[in-house]
Amino acid sequence: MKPVRTRFAPSPTGYLHIGGARTALFSWAYARRHGGDFILRIEDTDVARSTPEAVQAILDGMQWLGLEHDEGPFYQMQRMDRYKEVIQQMLANGSAYYCYTTREELDALRAEQEAKKEKPRYDGRWRPEAGKALPVPPTDVPPVIRFKNPQGGVVAWDDQVKGRIEFANTELDDLIIARADGTPTYNFCVCVDDWDMGITHVIRGDDHVNNTPRQINILKALGAEVPTYAHLSMILGDDGAKLSKRHGAVSVMQYDEEGFLTEAVINYLARLGWSHGDDEVFSRQQFVEWFDLDHITASAAQFNTEKLLWLNQHYMKQLPPAELAAKVQARLTARGVDTANGPDLEKAVVLYVDRSNTLNVLADAVEVFYAHVTPNPELLAQHLADDARPALAEFAAGIATVTWEAPAINALIKETVTKHGLKMPKLAMPLRVILTGQAQTPAVDAVIALIGRDKVAATLAAYL
């Protein structure tokens, strides 16, 4: 059996987005599952829109996702000589030809066809045929080069996601494979690349379905083996509309910036249009072992932000505390927060991780242990009632001698509220707001224990 070779071939006209990342993941996983090779190819022939920054963004995104390639990255702009060589071979063997039809002539042809309610298409006026007399080539019109598409029969393939797909060759006109300035076109370059690189399986978005029959015909004309195709359905946003920039994250790296873990994103992407029974949470290695093309759904996948957040929290809770603390430390350092003069960050993240679904949310929560807290006056007024002030003062006095552990602090709070005839929240809520600036925290005794006796005493003194 021929070794599996897959490829991811993005165009560097923007960031690596979720759809592209899923395509890359599925292509990578299929190669890994079958012990094959995963090739990275940058399709940068759109010179006007391709940028070095976009190339770097793609490479950064692939690295962050951990989708290492075995070969590449290959750049189409560096393969121009090869494309032109193949075009000359096709001209020589009659599978391509020069076309001198001008833009004005094509526009007139289109208008005529539309007036007759016909599908606009090239009429083959420069296509060589047995017994057909061609016009004399004009000297003032630089020609394009067209592929001589078969005129009869069908082009078909068994798509691994969508099933059998057929196109009548009469629906396909003679594709331009080289522009008038000599530069080869996208569909042609893709064919030569897949041929030269020995690609066996093409996994890509279903926006390429209409390109596939053209590419198959070109590959056959080249004498190349046609790869197996799997076209992935689109991804919809939370609202059921096609996923786009307005749904939030525009690039994979934005998920990193927003505090998502790589493994959570990988796990989530894997479930976007593929399933293994009812399994929701699985490792990268388990995904590779399970992944196949048979269980990719042909219907559109719907992005669910809440599910991604749930998964992210799950993976955060699975991290060793030291590793989780290191990730939060990096975010706090970037904010200019010094954690040297506060409690053990490892203990802080363990205390708050159950309430945090991203690293950023966790960093926000624990930052109060290392920064000066100024409670919102409205929040303070809402939770610090006049009848609670004597209890607050007594608690502040009691912390000087209490054993500095959460159970002992909890006992002091209960003793104080009982003595003053109050319910627990009457004292616990103002303590939360004064010490952390937050109305919602983990157990207040655990928070107080972590902040430290001296800082708690000094902070409470300012409100008595």
Curated annotation (Swiss-Prot):
One of its GO terms (cellular component) is cytosol. It comes from the Bacteria. A motif ('KMSKS' region) lies at residues 242-246. CDD domains: GluRS_core. Gene3D superfamilies: 1.10.10.350, HUPs. Its EC number is 6.1.1.17. PANTHER family: GLUTAMATE--TRNA LIGASE, GLUTAMATE--TRNA LIGASE, MITOCHONDRIAL-RELATED. Monomer. This is Glutamate--tRNA ligase. It comes from Dechloromonas aromatica (strain RCB). The lineage of its organism: Bacteria, Pseudomonadati, Pseudomonadota, Betaproteobacteria, Rhodocyclales.
